[in-house]
Design a protein with these regions (language model features):
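Short membrane-interface helical motifs at transmembrane helix boundaries
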Residues: 15, 74-93, 149-155
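Alpha-helical transmembrane segments of multi-pass membrane proteins
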Residues: 34, 77, 91-118, 137, ...
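Interhelical loop/hinge segments that connect adjacent transmembrane helices in multipass membrane
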Residues: 154-166, 180-209
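Transmembrane-helix boundary and interhelical linker motifs in polytopic inner-membrane proteins
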Residues: 17-21, 35-68, 87, 118-127
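Hydrophobic residues within alpha-helical transmembrane segments
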Residues: 28-31, 66-70, 104, 130-138, ...
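Helix-loop-helix hairpin linking two adjacent transmembrane segments in secondary transporters
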Residues: 136, 140-178
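Signature of the first transmembrane helix
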Residues: 1-44, 71-80, 105, 140, ...
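Alpha-helical transmembrane segments of multi-pass membrane transporters/permeases
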Residues: 1, 58-62, 68, 99-105, ...
Length: 209
């Protein structure tokens, strides 16, 4: 679904975003994909593997969620602190807000990894698919509204100085909606971190990453 929507939206992006800015958009999205792989650390696969063990499901759910939440939070805080130097390094010195949004997107997406895995493990494919589709549709609605209906003055007040920022912002809104929709599952997480289990998961997950 997300790939289909991206394919449909590409003509809109090409029409409203100049070539140089579109290259920035593409490069940053490639970077987001790479960072998401690193931050997930293969723990989605490890979650399925160790949850299948007898009496291990809750411990695996809690331990894997807290590890990914902590890792993603450390990444987010680091990027927010060193936002401008990072923006300078990647050539976004005039638009450091892109790097901030990128960090928030990565944080929210990785916070959702284990809850999404929980839905699949519990045999709830309809709920899993519904959340994914709602995210994609909401993201599409936001970006189309920004390009076609919302006045430029209003979007600029939200920090979107250029039209290339519209896809980034809409992606952030989609990721935020995902976290909200998954919040009932996130609230099931208990304050539990099993060290021995974590190291077993880490040993299993690292080659997968």
């Amino acid at each position: 679904m997300p790939r289909i929507i991206l394919f449909v939206l590409n003509p809109l992006y090409i029409h409203y975003i100049n070539t140089n800015d579109f290259a920035k958009f593409s490069n940053l999205y490639a970077l987001i994909s790479f960072v998401n792989i690193v931050l997930s650390f293969g723990f989605e696969t490890a979650y399925f593997r160790f949850s299948a063990e007898k009496d291990n499901e809750k411990k695996t759910f809690n331990t894997s969620f807290w590890f990914m939440a902590l890792l993603s939070a450390l990444f987010l805080v680091s990027v927010l602190i060193f936002n401008q130097p990072i923006a300078n390094y990647f050539g976004y010195e005039k638009n450091p807000e892109y790097i901030k949004w990128f960090a928030w997107i990565a944080f929210l997406d990785n916070l959702a990894v284990i809850p999404f895995a929980w839905l699949r493990f519990k045999g709830m494919p309809i709920k899993y698919t519904a959340v994914r589709i709602l995210q994609s549709l909401f993201q599409t609605l936001v970006v189309v509204a920004l390009f076609l209906w919302i006045p430029t003055e209003f979007s600029q007040k939200l920090g979107m100085k250029e039209k290339v920022s519209f896809p980034f912002f809409s992606n952030l809104m989609g990721s935020l909606l995902g976290a909200v929709l998954l919040s009932p599952i996130i609230f099931k997480v208990q304050l539990q971190f099993v060290k021995d289990l974590f190291f077993r998961m880490l040993k299993y997950a690292f080659p997968v990453m």
